[in-house]
Curated annotation (Swiss-Prot):
Membrane topology of the entry: Single-pass membrane protein
The protein's assembly and partners: The cyanobacterial PSI reaction center is composed of one copy each of PsaA,B,C,D,E,F,I,J,K,L,M and X, and forms dimeric and tetrameric complexes.
Entry's transmembrane regions: 14-34
Alphabetical keyword list: Membrane, Photosynthesis, Photosystem I, Thylakoid, Transmembrane, Transmembrane helix
The name this protein goes by in its record: Photosystem I reaction center subunit IX
Length: 49
């Protein structure tokens, strides 16, 4: 059985891979945009003058 140091090393290596990092990044970005649009619905997209 692997010890705690190996398990945390594998977890950090897994989280830092590109697909996982991109998924986390896009989820956070989408959440920020959704919440911004919920509080300020008219400010996200400006119509052309």
């Amino acid at each position: 059985m692997a010890d705690k140091a190996d398990q945390s090393s594998y977890l950090i290596k897994f989280i830092s891979t590109a697909p996982v990092a991109a998924t986390i990044w896009l989820t956070i970005t989408a959440g920020i945009l959704i919440e911004f649009n919920r509080f300020f619905p008219d400010l996200l997209f400006h119509p052309l003058p």
